[in-house]
């Protein structure tokens, strides 16, 4: 990053509608697969759209890094819980890719209650020349069969097939907020407000409850689970975050029920900063292990923090995302914006972190140089192949020409969901119903 931030450019954006936004079109999750060749998005209408990276060609060297629609399918439908008289939204809360084992790809998608496993396969050949069936698959009249032939495979237009493999239901009383695939490639966990369940990918009718923070009396409830994730290398370790701002690292080798954590990561509160909003803004909305497994990244309302697994007392790094909003917490509380759940992401080398903000802004922080940049994802400022200009929010006093004042920020335009390519400087940004894909100009010019 550093000097290179000004040369970050947009490749293209996927715009679903130019005139108005329907609620169903709003993107609710973004996820690269383990190679970065595929990118999946889920929306509030229960749809999953998969994008595939274009192969680099000699004729069009600038196409390197571009993504095209690969497949679209309906993952979840709206349902109704007759026992509780509750509607279950079709909105896709999370998508997680499984490590690729063969030519097919697999992913998990979840709404509030049900997790589904999908298999994505390609077909570019079809069998022809059957002896007992015609081209449409109907049985021939045997009296007309005078000779035998060997069936052959003929090329055909590429067809992407998405098929449901398994449905994991009835595991959660409360709304599922996160799913995470284990490094053993056989199990995954799902978390709701009060419980975390461990599933085997091959078994749909039962799961093991590994965390349960539900008190005997619900009036004694003081915190809820907000996010959880498995360690990238140690299949026995996982972390979950809470609405009180704490992180609990658990070891499944210690006990079947991990109510007693191995480590508690919590930053002591500064009494001088105590206010009515302190607990709300300290709630962790996302937690991500670094690729190395040494660090954890958390996002609360105003900051992103980096934690070392070997130091529980406080984070080793704290970055202010939009500290200028501290004076506006009252109005943000009244509009419910203070409860927005922003995600965070690491780059492939764990040296840069990214998270979203309001006004379609997103922030990047370089951990080595300590430099940061604010960029904007919008149709107005982002033409294909245009260089993204850093933006600056002005709190008061003198304003530069391109500065934007805090009072003119649009809080309906928010970047909640972001993803970073696992190896390259390619990022995906969800802005309401638009998906933007950016890549580093320096990175692309090297090829």
Swiss-Prot record:
State how it assembles. Answer: PP2A consists of a common heterodimeric core enzyme, composed of a 36 kDa catalytic subunit (subunit C) and a 65 kDa constant regulatory subunit (PR65 or subunit A), that associates with a variety of regulatory subunits. Proteins that associate with the core dimer include three families of regulatory subunits B (the R2/B/PR55/B55, R3/B''/PR72/PR130/PR59 and R5/B'/B56 families), the 48 kDa variable regulatory subunit, viral proteins, and cell signaling molecules. Interacts with IER5.
- Lineage of origin: Eukaryota, Metazoa, Chordata, Craniata, Vertebrata
Domain of life from the UniProt record: Eukaryota
UniProt lists the family membership as follows: Belongs to the phosphatase 2A regulatory subunit B family.
Question: Source species, please?
Answer: Mus musculus
- Which function does this protein serve? The B regulatory subunit might modulate substrate selectivity and catalytic activity, and might also direct the localization of the catalytic enzyme to a particular subcellular compartment.
Keywords annotated in UniProt = Repeat, WD repeat
Q: SUPFAM superfamilies from the xrefs?
A: WD40 repeat-like
The protein's name in its UniProt record: Serine/threonine-protein phosphatase 2A 55 kDa regulatory subunit B gamma isoform
Database matches in Gene3D superfamilies: YVTN repeat-like/Quinoprotein amine dehydrogenase
Q: Which GO terms describe its cellular component?
A: protein phosphatase type 2A complex
Checking InterPro entries in the record gives:
PP2A_PR55, PP2A_PR55_CS, WD40/YVTN_repeat-like_dom_sf, WD40_repeat_dom_sf, WD40_rpt
Mapped WD repeat ranges: 22-61, 87-128, 171-209, 220-260, 279-317, 334-375, 410-446
One of the entry's Gene Ontology molecular-function terms is: protein phosphatase regulator activity
């Amino acid at each position: 990053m550093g000097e290179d931030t000004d040369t970050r450019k947009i490749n293209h954006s996927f715009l679903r509608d130019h005139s108005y936004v329907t609620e169903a079109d709003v993107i609710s999750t973004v996820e690269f697969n383990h190679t970065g060749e595929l990118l999946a998005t889920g929306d509030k209408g229960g749809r999953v759209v998969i994008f595939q990276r274009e192969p680099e060609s000699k004729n069009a060297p600038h196409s390197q890094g571009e993504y095209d629609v690969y497949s679209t399918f309906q993952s979840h439908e709206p349902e109704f819980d007759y026992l509780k008289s509750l509607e279950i939204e079709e909105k896709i809360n999370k998508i997680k890719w499984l490590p690729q084992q063969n030519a097919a790809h697999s992913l998990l998608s979840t709404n509030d209650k049900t997790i589904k496993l999908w298999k994505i396969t390609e077909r570019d050949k079809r069998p022809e020349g059957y002896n007992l069936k015609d081209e449409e698959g109907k049985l021939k009249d045997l009296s007309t069969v005078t000779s035998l032939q060997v069936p052959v495979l003929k090329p055909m237009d590429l067809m992407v097939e998405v098929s449901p493999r398994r449905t994991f239901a009835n595991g959660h009383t409360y709304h599922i907020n996160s799913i995470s695939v284990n490094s053993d490639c056989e199990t995954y966990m799902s978390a709701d407000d009060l419980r975390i369940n461990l599933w085997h990918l091959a078994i749909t009718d039962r799961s093991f409850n590994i965390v349960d923070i539900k008190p005997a009396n619900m009036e004694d409830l003081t915190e809820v689970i907000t996010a959880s994730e498995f360690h990238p290398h140690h299949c026995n370790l996982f972390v979950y975050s809470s609405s009180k701002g704490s992180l609990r690292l658990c070891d499944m080798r210690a006990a079947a029920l991990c109510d007693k954590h191995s480590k508690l990561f919590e930053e002591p509160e500064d009494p001088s900063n105590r206010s009515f909003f302190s607990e709300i803004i300290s709630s962790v909305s996302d937690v991500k292990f670094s690729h190395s497994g040494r660090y954890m990244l958390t996002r609360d309302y105003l900051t992103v923090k980096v934690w070392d697994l070997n130091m529980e007392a406080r984070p080793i790094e704290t970055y202010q995302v939009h500290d200028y909003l501290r004076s506006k917490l009252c109005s943000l509380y009244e509009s419910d914006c203070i409860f927005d759940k922003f995600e965070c992401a690491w780059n492939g080398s764990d040296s840069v972190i990214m998270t979203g903000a309001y006004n379609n802004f997103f922030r990047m922080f370089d951990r080595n140089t300590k430099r940061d940049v604010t960029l904007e994802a919008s149709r107005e400022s982002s033409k294909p192949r245009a260089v993204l200009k850093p933006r600056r929010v002005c709190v008061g006093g003198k304003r530069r020409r391109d500065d934007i004042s805090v009072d003119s920020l649009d809080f309906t335009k928010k970047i909640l969901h972001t993803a970073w390519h696992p190896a390259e400087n390619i990022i995906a940004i969800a802005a309401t119903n638009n998906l933007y894909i950016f890549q580093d100009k320096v990175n692309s010019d090297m090829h």
